[in-house]
Amino acid sequence: MAALTRDPQFQKLQQWYREHRSELNLRRLFDANKDRFNHFSLTLNTNHGHILVDYSKNLVTEDVMRMLVDLAKSRGVEAARERMFNGEKINYTEGRAVLHVALRNRSNTPILVDGKDVMPEVNKVLDKMKSFCQRVRSGDWKGYTGKTITDVINIGIGGSDLGPLMVTEALKPYSSGGPRVWYVSNIDGTHIAKTLAQLNPESSLFIIASKTFTTQETITNAETAKEWFLQAAKDPSAVAKHFVALSTNTTKVKEFGIDPQNMFEFWDWVGGRYSLWSAIGLSIALHVGFDNFEQLLSGAHWMDQHFRTTPLEKNAPVLLALLGIWYINCFGCETHAMLPYDQYLHRFAAYFQQGDMESNGKYITKSGTRVDHQTGPIVWGEPGTNGQHAFYQLIHQGTKMIPCDFLIPVQTQHPIRKGLHHKILLANFLAQTEALMRGKSTEEARKELQAAGKSPEDLERLLPHKVFEGNRPTNSIVFTKLTPFMLGALVAMYEHKIFVQGIIWDINSFDQWGVELGKQLAKKIEPELDGSAQVTSHDASTNGLINFIKQQREARVQ
């Protein structure tokens, strides 16, 4: 594929941007077209609620959207989409298919990898998860002293942690009757020490989530958990009742003391950051029940079907991806804010930090050459309204343009005080996108200050500070209610957005070589931290840091 910057469709887009950028004023665009909302919004209707994607507050015209869709076609998005769904090995650096869509393929249509249908294996693992969840949640599964399981501790990192953690937080209202869940990821001993201090070994079940069962952070934490458990249980055979594995390495799992019957498998065509739909989601299913886990899968499958079959110009993941391309590759935007107005989604932005930045944080193309354009953005965000009192100042009046996605459910899980809290939340959600779009003109600010009774001197002094330029782009994503189905659909929508952008940039969204170098160096440095000898084998900075740490380790601190 030709480089993006040499694609005639991209060059056409860039030329339009250079010639017409100054005309893109959102106030004027809305004034000129009273039907703008209808032209630049989509409503996705499911049997489990509706999703409105309003992209009318973006710096686009119908010409721009047409050119963006033409660019997607020119870059081969439709063909690439089919290659993914057909099980082709689109993860070309690792020679793997990319089939998280198979994990939630509720239609159960055959999906082939190397000529073999993967669906029987997928369904077999789902059946095993269902049976296990029923045993634990019903109290049939007992610990070594005969107690039922009250706490499930997922030990994993990256994709084996972020997805299940985000989902179990998001679906807390659906957890009735399930065990509590805890997540330990960090190698920092504080994480596991603080967690274990709150648990009873007799009623705790540990899930060790590691494909290879060799991930340093995960296995170190798992060994610590086992040591803690055996201090109480004494008998190593009790491990089998309190530890299960999500892995593909039967030998290592057995060595650890876990019964292979309690090993839940997944496959090399499941990438870590796309794995919550697999056995990696066992903690989700235990917490909210397998029926709700299936609803999560069904919502994602609904979005998969929408993504696969809907024309590009009406395709929610495609449109979100193209708007991102417009801002990143024409406007030079470097970050993207995800702002969910729902406290249950407080880990949503953190989840997609990995989802987006590990997928598209690449500068090498499929042909092995360096890109000559920007790729993945820095993704960040916090729940509203907390963010309004923290960083929205920079979004409104800072010097950087930050495209934002605002998300909110129409119905709350907690309609306390006759829905007052949620009405205030909705009002803030609506006000922010309007404020970012409209801003406040000098004349409007002047009238406001006059009405407040400011003296002419104070008015002129304050006036420039009270002006908002506006013209800040946002998407508003409004959905009926945050249910398991709806969460599945939203997560899949963003997954496919990331995929489309990777295709347009001609990078591999499904490897993560950038994770490797630091891990390699850490293995070399770890033994150098032993003893008191000065270290000189690195650059001056790294040597200095190591030697300071060694010196201070023995220092007495009051």
Curated annotation (Swiss-Prot):
Consequence when changing residue 5 to I: In CNSHA4; GPI Matsumoto
GO terms under biological process: canonical glycolysis; carbohydrate metabolic process; erythrocyte homeostasis; fructose 6-phosphate metabolic process; gluconeogenesis; glucose 6-phosphate metabolic process; glucose homeostasis; glycolytic process
N6-succinyllysine sites (modified residues): 454
Keyword annotations: Acetylation, Cytokine, Cytoplasm, Disease variant, Gluconeogenesis, Glycolysis, Growth factor, Hereditary hemolytic anemia, Hydroxylation, Isomerase, Phosphoprotein, Secreted, Ubl conjugation
Reactions accelerated catalytically: alpha-D-glucose 6-phosphate = beta-D-fructose 6-phosphate
Annotated Gene Ontology cellular component terms: ciliary membrane; cytosol; extracellular exosome; extracellular region; ficolin-1-rich granule lumen; membrane; secretory granule lumen
Entry-linked SUPFAM superfamilies: SIS domain
GO molecular function: carbohydrate derivative binding; cytokine activity; glucose-6-phosphate isomerase activity; growth factor activity; monosaccharide binding; ubiquitin protein ligase binding
Mutation effect (residue 347 to C): In CNSHA4; GPI Mount Scopus
Active-site residues from the entry: 358 (proton donor), 389, 519
Record's disease association: Anemia, congenital, non-spherocytic hemolytic, 4: An autosomal recessive form of anemia in which there is no abnormal hemoglobin or spherocytosis. It is caused by glucose phosphate isomerase deficiency.
Name of the protein this chain belongs to: Glucose-6-phosphate isomerase
